[in-house]
Amino acid sequence: MMDKHKYRVEIQQMMFVSGEINDPPVETTSLIEDIVRGQVIEILLQSNKTAHLRGSRSILPEDVIFLIRHDKAKVNRLRTYLSWKDLRKNAKDQDASAGVASGTGNPGAGGEDDLKKAGGGEKDEKDGGNMMKVKKSQIKLPWELQFMFNEHPLENNDDNDDMDEDEREANIVTLKRLKMADDRTRNMTKEEYVHWSDCRQASFTFRKNKRFKDWSGISQLTEGKPHDDVIDILGFLTFEIVCSLTETALKIKQREQVLQTQKDKSQQSSQDNTNFEFASSTLHRKKRLFDGPENVINPLKPRHIEEAWRVLQTIDMRHRALTNFKGGRLSSKPIIM
C-alpha cells in the first residue's frame, strides 16, 4: 500500500525554520501533513463555492484571498509575495524580449542599418531606459473600499507611498520572524547556515505542481482549471500553516516544561536536590544543529500538535455570534489558518 504522506522532508524543513529540532518523529510530521491537507481541501471547497457565486467555474486568486480577508497581516504578506513574483516574471520577459531585439538584424543591409542606428540611437536609449524600469505591481482586491465608489482617485506612480495600518502590521510580523531567524543563525557555522538556507526554500508547490495536485485532489474538487496563481497562493498558505502549528506547539511544549519543572520543585523540596539540579542543568544546555539525539531534549509530539490545532481553531470572540435561541450542539466549519 502506497504511503499517503508525501511531504515529510518538506515539513521537517519548515518545522526546523520555525524553531523545531532537525528530526521530528514521523508521527508528528504525518499529523501535520494530514492537517495541512485538510486545510487545503477546505480552502478549495470554499473557494469553489465563492467562484460559483460569481458565476465562474474556475477559481481565481481573489476567491482564495477572500477566505483569509480578516487576517490583514497575512493578506498583505501574500500580496507582497504575489507582487514580487509578478515583478520577477516581468523582468524575465523583458530580458528575453531585449535579447531578441538585440540579436535580430539583416546583415545584407549594412548601410541602411547603420543609418537607422545613427538616426535612432537616442530612441533606442530611451527604449532601453524604459525597459529597465520594472515596477512592482500592486494586487488590488475587489472588496476593498476604493471599489465601492464609481470614481477612483488618480494613481500615484511614485514608489514612496505611505504605508497603511495593515501594511505596518504585516511588516511587524515579518520583522519578528526575521529577528527570530537572526537569533537562531547568529552562532551557526557555514555548513549549518547553508542547511538553514536550504530549509527556508522548502515548499509544497515549487516545482512540485503535479505531486501537489495529486496529493490535494484539485481535479476532483474543482470543475475548471484553477488559475496559475492559485497554486502559488496555496503553496504560500501551506507554509504559513506549518509555521503556525509549529510555533504554537513549541509554546505549548515550553509551558508544559515550565509546569513540570514547578511540579518537580514542589515534590523534591524536602528531598535531596541533586537529581533536580542535574536535570535542570541539562535542560538548559545549548543544542547544536548537528548534535545527536538526546533523551533530555524532547521533540514535538503529536499531542503538542493536536493542542496547537485546538488553540488555532478557537473562534475569536469578535467573530462569534450569540446562539441563545438555536439550542443543541453548535456546528462550525474548520477555520482557515
UniProtKB/Swiss-Prot annotation:
Entry protein name: SAGA complex subunit SPT3
Top-level lineage group: Eukaryota
Entry keyword annotation includes Methyltransferase: no
Subcellular localization: Nucleus; Cytoplasm
Organism this protein belongs to: Saccharomyces cerevisiae (strain ATCC 204508 / S288c)
GO CC annotations on file: cytosol; nucleus; SAGA complex; SLIK (SAGA-like) complex
Phosphoserine: modified positions: S270
Keywords of the record: Activator, Cytoplasm, Nucleus, Phosphoprotein, Transcription, Transcription regulation
GO biological process: chromatin organization; invasive growth in response to glucose limitation; pseudohyphal growth; regulation of transcription by RNA polymerase II; transcription by RNA polymerase II
